[in-house]
């Protein structure tokens, strides 16, 4: 599909991830394929698992999970499928979100705007693209960062944003993308992100996925992600979109 018009209703909606796509940690943790090795991440995951088990999730179901999003989603699915009341579900999710939120704050305290983020967003805006943001970060984190001068107030470019606080299930589940599509009233979109969870959510929601390779993935890892295109920075995105 080729979109050359500057009418935003004839161009795909462009959705962005935040961490690793628009901003990044100044001192990047070591990543091997899709897993990130960082001491604090392990501690957070252990805390999340302990909370899940405390609320009745079998330890054998969560102990093998090595991603925070997987722990979150599995716990949510378990309590929903086992007849927990809505009030109890909210308690479980709130408690599991406490260490998640602590990790948000720690990561963002040492994050910075990626080069070319603002120039790339401005170029897309001038060409008439409608843009939105879908992140696994909390609403508090997104609102603080996206409106801060140190991060270029990049939130000004997005009419809509969806964070984990508005969702039952988070990426790699497609729910966050489905929610923003419903808000905007669109079903044609391109999602720009840096992880396997971004790729999986985008494909599951029926969109195109553009990998921004800020993690320096090798060729084999990129193939596993199965992106529709690969860019190194956001200034390359508009040209890439012209080829869809």
List the predicted regions and their residue ranges.
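Active-site neighborhood of HAD-like aspartate-dependent phosphohydrolases
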Residues: 2-64
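Conserved Lys-Pro-Asp/Glu-containing loop-to-beta segment of HAD-superfamily phosphomonoesterases
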Residues: 9-10, 170-199
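Metal-dependent phosphoesterase signature
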Residues: 76-119
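Short, acidic loop-to-helix structural element flanking the phosphoryl-transfer center
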Residues: 105-133, 143, 174
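Surface-exposed amphipathic alpha-helices with a cationic face
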Residues: 121-125, 181, 199-203
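Histidine/lysine/aspartate-rich catalytic loop segments that bind and position anionic ligands
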Residues: 135-171
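Acidic, Mg2+-coordinating phosphoryl-transfer loop and its flanking beta/alpha structural elements
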Residues: 190-229
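Short acidic-hydrophobic, aromatic-tinged amphipathic segments that line or gate anion-handling sites
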Residues: 229-236
């Amino acid at each position: 599909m080729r979109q050359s018009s500057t009418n935003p209703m004839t161009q795909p909606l462009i959705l962005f991830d935040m961490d690793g796509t628009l901003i990044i940690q100044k001192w990047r943790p070591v990543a091997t394929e899709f897993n990130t090795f960082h001491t604090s991440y392990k501690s957070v995951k252990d805390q999340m698992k302990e909370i899940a088990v405390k609320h009745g999730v079998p330890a054998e179901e969560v102990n093998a999970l090595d991603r925070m999003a997987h722990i979150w989603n599995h716990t949510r699915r378990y309590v929903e499928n086992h007849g927990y009341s809505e009030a109890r579900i909210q308690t479980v999710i709130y408690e599991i979100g406490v260490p998640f939120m602590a990790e948000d704050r720690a990561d963002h305290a040492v994050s910075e705007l990626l080069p070319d983020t603002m120039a790339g967003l401005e170029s897309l805006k001038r060409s008439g693209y409608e843009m939105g943001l879908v992140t696994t970060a909390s609403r508090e984190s997104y609102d603080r960062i996206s409106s801060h001068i140190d991060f270029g107030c990049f939130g000004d470019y997005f009419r809509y944003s969806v964070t984990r606080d508005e969702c039952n299930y988070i990426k790699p589940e497609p729910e966050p993308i489905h929610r923003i599509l419903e808000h905007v009233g669109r079903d044609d979109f391109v999602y720009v992100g840096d992880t396997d969870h971004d790729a999986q959510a985008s494909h599951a929601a029926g969109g195109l996925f553009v990998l921004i390779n800020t993690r320096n993935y090798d060729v084999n890892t990129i193939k596993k992600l199965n992106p529709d295109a690969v860019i190194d920075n956001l200034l390359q995105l508009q040209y890439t979109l012209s080829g869809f």
